[in-house]
């Protein structure tokens, strides 16, 4: 299983959020790569935009799977690449899980609203990312999110971000077992585009979670674990 993190972080956030749900699945090998320009993965000048990153990720998927079917999951920008990979490799991707996906056609993105916690807790990045401002959420932010910022290649991110939208794929929608999870209070990507996208897929479970924003994997971990567990069960049923 290949799990792709979001923008401005590295594999540590994805691993912290997905691993509790996947650790007990027998025989499931999880791979958490750093996307180009984050963590320990360089972003050479040949990567000019998202289409180039997608091609690199498709090669990675082919390499780590050896051509066998594999699962794909992603959060935020990682979900954007994951759904594109599934569209281009439908016979190879056995299941797709998207959490707070960045997607074309964003609409009705809500204003940021804090639902609980202490005023003034954490730094500006924390307060803009989380809708639960509690000591527990701050601890997760400081452990899994903030340290990755120092390893981001800002110049590379700006270069690739200038061409962030992928070239549309002409094929049919991905038809494998899919999970789409969105935060109702997500002020980064909203939930409307995720709802639209899930509606276009023939075998998608959609969950729009209240009291959760773009940091949904941190804010609603038990619910995410349950949804991922059900998704894995569906994948096994299809196998």
Which ranges hold each PLM region?
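Conserved alpha/beta-hydrolase "nucleophile elbow" surrounding the catalytic nucleophile
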Residues: 5, 74-76, 183
